[in-house]
Amino acid sequence: MSDAHGIARDQLRAFIERIERLEEEKKTIADDIKDVYGEAKSMGFDAKILRKVISIRKQDADERMEQEAILDTYLQALGMIPAVEAEDAA
């Protein structure tokens, strides 16, 4: 029975060590991404807009169009953009 506990303990240790290695890799990658944003900023690009572009590129076209339509609806409701009337669309 102690052999089974030893195997479980070894498996648990292996999982923990793999997760720790992956967490370290994730931190390294996050640091690399931060460096790229800094480099882009130093070249005159807006990091906030770059993040937005990357976010948009991750979406599929239908999802993006749906979100843009909802955003337009909210902005129109707040008077931040002119409302499109039915006669204007025709």
UniProtKB/Swiss-Prot annotation:
Q: Name one GO molecular function term.
A: DNA binding
InterPro entries in the cross-refs: GapR-like, GapR-like_DNA-bd
The secretion signal range is none
Give the top-rank taxon of the lineage listed in the UniProt record for this protein. Answer: Bacteria
Similarity comment: Belongs to the UPF0335 family.
Name of the protein in question: UPF0335 protein R02793
Native species:
Rhizobium meliloti (strain 1021) (Ensifer meliloti)
